[in-house]
Amino acid sequence: MTETIKGTCHCGNLTAALNTEKKPQDMWLRACQCDFCRSHNMRSLSDADGRLEISVQDKSQFNRYHFGLNMVDFLICKLCGNYIGAVQQVDGQLFGIINANLTENRGERFGEAEHRFYEEETGKERSARRKAVWTPATLRIVS
């Protein structure tokens, strides 16, 4: 049975829908320990066998933030400041994660997040990991 986990930034400019066969309590919730993710209290959610669609209602109020190795687009709403998730192109395909804290019930049904440390990974290792565990994604800009 397919479940759709929906999320939105505070003002609704950015939305996400993760289609998965997994039950929420069985999904692997991660808490990256980099400064950026910790400052946003990010708990990331993905399913390599699922499908993620992130939509932007007003592109003038949308920011793709980059830092570190500049490999990933961190998707931030300029209106409310929320970070809904991130995407990266790997081998011509887009992969993404969503912020479980911005999903319905604010991620309460997912349980505790596993703290993850990625600073020792090379860019190639990061791309391989993301391709393996992030969700195949589309980014749709409405206007």
Language model regions located:
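A short Gly-Trp-Pro
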Residues: M1-T8, N13-S143
